[in-house]
Regions:
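Solvent-exposed loop and edge beta-strand segments that line ligand/cofactor-binding
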Residues: 15-28, 70-86, 123-140, 192-193, ...
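Secondary-structure capping and boundary motifs in well-ordered enzyme cores
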Residues: 23-26, 81-88, 106, 110-117, ...
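CBM-like, beta-strand-rich accessory domains located in the C-terminal region of large
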Residues: 218, 224, 319-491
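Active-site lining segments of carbohydrate-active enzymes
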Residues: 32-136, 147-150, 222, 236-253
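Active-site-adjacent structural elements in enzyme catalytic domains
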Residues: 1-39, 47-60, 170-173
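Long, repeat-rich segments with strong aromatic
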Residues: 111, 118-119, 124-156, 264-271, ...
Length: 491
């Protein structure tokens, strides 16, 4: 019964006139599905269906990619430095392997070209496995990377060094350790904050790189997924890839930094005590794919409650949404701007998308571990320097210190966070309340600074609605160098 249904679906999609080559991700995903169906169902497919599938994979996918490899420029889907590269090339490799017995030279050529260009994307995983495109595209990229590595190793006995690229083996460990105590992800870039994707990426990596803690992490996700019924499309591979390996949980370091285009900074309080803090922050490079003006932003949690938020992505079809230039229309949309993030603005102006954030100093061995970001180029033309320091005073308190050298004392600096909690402001103190718990923010300096709160609102009617979020902010001015210190406390 199931085989008959699957065969009907294969026949149906193979009779499409094309697989939407103008958006080649569609071709790649369809080729992946058809190749897997053809391989798994080969023995029960009618000869006419096999012939149709082989013809469709060749004419609707593989024949098209030969020319792309030959003439495509650096921004071609086959060669670019984003998720498109891995997803599209993986789809072509799976299609080539599926029909290799019919077209061996074509398959050899496509596999050779794919493994040549896939490193263009994966080089950005160095050194610590961070996918700069954010967690949503981490999942998309690594799911197809898992399919690629499994197919190459199973069929050809090697993956041509792809799995040995710096950072690839660390990628799932990074993602696992940057998942918060509430089970949510650090949803920077165009990502939502939902729990980690229930994809079998974890089982592939746990086996390939001998990481039993990854398998244990994913089994917990799987059990919750089964209970919720919220299955992802590659969920079925969790069965053949299942990994029973177990490992005791390692003690979490107070401060861990994962370096990359987006440096990810993670502070962990002792989770065995009430109100312990979890804080995760980032540097970044806003003009890279899917980035927002969010350098210096941070998410903080206590008691499994997220106190500062990220609104995620807006509609991809908005005019100018993909214009990353400093004056690009992308930055006029609220969710993409620094005004919607937990960071700074100077004179209520946008961060500079051509700027970057970098780690300046850190000490993860100190009794009070700290990390300092240099965000100066992010505010080019607005300031002389900008540094943000996070210092963990103890398990329940973190001090955020911003040092801003302004061009003149008449300028103002806005310090802000966005939250879904209820907010009570009283001078230099704000108390956030949610689910029967509370969290406090206190401005330590300047002594005359105070908090205000306002509802978060989208910039235009075309943007996604925003409901239930508050912007908590403080504005300071009057000095050529501003030092803003805010104490975050779960007490």
């Amino acid at each position: 019964r199931f085989a008959e249904k699957a065969e009907r679906e294969l026949i149906h999609v193979c009779n499409f006139s094309d697989w939407d080559p103008v958006h080649y991700l569609d071709v790649a995903e369809m080729t992946t599905a058809v190749a897997i169906g053809y391989d798994w169902l080969y023995d029960v497919l009618a000869p006419s269906t096999r012939q149709l599938v082989v013809h469709s994979i060749k004419t609707k996918a593989l024949d098209l990619v030969v020319e792309e490899y030959k003439t495509g420029n650096a921004d071609s889907w086959a060669k670019r430095e984003t998720n498109w590269n891995v997803v599209c090339n993986t789809g072509m490799v799976l299609g080539a392997l599926a029909i290799e017995e019919h077209y061996p030279e074509l398959a050899k050529h496509i596999i050779g070209e794919a493994v040549r260009y896939i490193p263009n994307c994966l080089k950005h995983f160095a050194p610590d496995g961070v996918c700069y495109e954010g967690p949503a595209y981490w999942g998309y990229t690594n799911m197809y990377l898992s399919l690629l590595l499994k197919a190459l190793n199973d069929n050809l006995g090697e993956d041509f060094g792809i799995s040995e690229m710096v950072g690839v083996d660390k990628s799932v460990l990074y993602y696992m350790h940057s998942t918060s105590p509430s089970g949510k992800i650090f949803n920077f870039a165009n990502s939502g904050s939902t729990a980690p994707a229930a994809e079998p990426i974890y089982f592939y990596f746990s086996r390939a790189f001998n990481q039993p803690e990854v398998a244990a992490f994913y089994r917990d996700i799987l059990s919750k997924t089964v209970q919720s019924g919220n299955y992802f499309r590659f969920y079925f591979l969790s069965i053949p890839w299942y990994d029973t390996a177990s490992s005791p949980a390692d003690a979490l370091p107070k401060l861990k930094v994962y370096e990359g285009i987006n440096d990810i900074i993670v502070f962990n309080g002792n989770r065995n005590i009430p109100n312990s803090l979890y804080l995760i922050a980032k540097t970044g490079d806003p003009d890279m794919a899917h980035q927002q003006l969010d350098i210096g932003t941070f998410i903080i949690e206590t008691n499994g409650i997220r106190w500062t938020d990220d609104l995620g992505s807006d509609n991809y079809g908005l005019p100018g949404f993909w214009d990353y230039k400093p004056d690009g229309q992308r930055w006029t949309y609220f969710r993409n701007s620094n005004f919607s993030h937990n960071t700074l603005s100077i004179d209520h102006r946008l961060q500079n998308s051509a700027g970057t954030g970098e780690i300046d100093r850190l000490d993860n061995k100190a009794a009070q571990p700290f990390v300092t970001m240099d965000m100066s180029t992010t505010y080019a033309g607005q300031s002389r320097f900008v540094y943000r320091t996070f210092r963990m005073l103890d398990d329940v308190r973190i001090l955020v210190t911003d040092s801003i050298g302004l061009q003149n004392p008449s300028q103002s600096v806005q310090w802000s966070v966005i939250t879904s909690a209820n907010v009570e402001c009283k001078g230099n103190t704000a108390v956030l309340k949610k689910d029967g718990k509370s969290f406090s923010l206190k401005i330590v300096s300047p002594v005359d600074a105070f908090f205000t709160a306002r509802a978060a609102k989208r910039g235009t009617e075309a943007e996604k609605p925003i409901e239930g979020y508050t912007i908590l902010s403080a504005s300071v001015s009057g000095e050529p160098v501003q030092v803003i210190k805010v104490l975050l406390s779960g007490e």
